[in-house]
Amino acid sequence: MRKLAVLTSGGDSPGMNAAVRAAVRRAHFHEVQMFGVYHGYEGLMRGDIKEMSLGSVGDIIQRGGTILYSARSEAFKTEAGQQRAVEQLRAHEIEGLIVIGGDGSFRGAQKLTEKGFPTIGVPGTIDNDIPCTDFTIGFDTALNTVVEAIDKIRDTATSHERTYIIEVMGRDAGDLALWAGLAAGAESIMIPEASQDMDDIIERLHAGQRRGKKHSIIIVAEGVGSAASYAEAITKETGWETRVTVLGHIQRGGSPTAMDRMLASRMGAAAVDLLLEGKQDRMVGVQNNQIVDVDFQEALAKKHQLDLSIYQLARTLSI
């Protein structure tokens, strides 16, 4: 292969730029041309493709977001859209494509492989919800952003003796809520993977109050429902002043942590190596701190498994 391309798709995550940088520089190391596809699959169908030099990825390792931009595309989900994407790649004489994104992005990459075009996936999402990899690019940065926010909210919760409910992202996965809750010492954590009824939460709050605790932090993953509804229920049952903070898209932004920069660099370079080895229809991952690659079909068929031992630990430490 003499020409490769890279695109970012779906929700942005801190570290995507580091992965793009690694892919471009690894390709140049192997004397292979690298092209950037701008605006995800939507841009791919339009032919928004430009060659990337070593200088084009200078000073981006520390930047959040993605210099290639990202967009969701309904048109790409169609047979005609996918065929148009392949035609654009071949028109530019590109022989392999690296897709950085989440499970939806990988399904798109798999469609291209089915049409005879080699693709490799790199997991980039703050949700950490991709099977077959311990971590995804952006999770560590988002985790640190959430913990920092919780620490600040706890200051005001303590000052006003209030209960605060903080809603974090994650779609149907509770990793971000769970890890942040443990790291920030939350009194209760609500995630999709572990049922916890309101009576249990209120009893734990009452138990803390009996020990002299005058404020509480509850972390709610967006996949379990609205934080506002839980706040209303707690106020109704206890009469306590309860506030809600929805952290929102602040969790996606910011300069990536050293951990995310390292992970993205390793994964981006590995994706290039896999294509040059003649591999395709695979996803790069990290397991036990070792870079691995797994079949797309295997990764997409499995369900992400949250480590419930962390949840049990958080419950025992929040008494």
Curated annotation (Swiss-Prot):
HAMAP family: Phosphofructokinase_I_B1 (MF_00339). It catalyses: beta-D-fructose 6-phosphate + ATP = beta-D-fructose 1,6-bisphosphate + ADP + H(+). It comes from Brevibacillus brevis (strain 47 / JCM 6285 / NBRC 100599). Catalyzes the phosphorylation of D-fructose 6-phosphate to fructose 1,6-bisphosphate by ATP, the first committing step of glycolysis. Signal peptide: none annotated. Belongs to the phosphofructokinase type A (PFKA) family. ATP-dependent PFK group I subfamily. Prokaryotic clade 'B1' sub-subfamily. This is ATP-dependent 6-phosphofructokinase. GO terms for cellular component: 6-phosphofructokinase complex. The gene is pfkA. Keywords: Allosteric enzyme, ATP-binding, Cytoplasm, Glycolysis, Kinase, Magnesium, Metal-binding, Nucleotide-binding, Transferase.
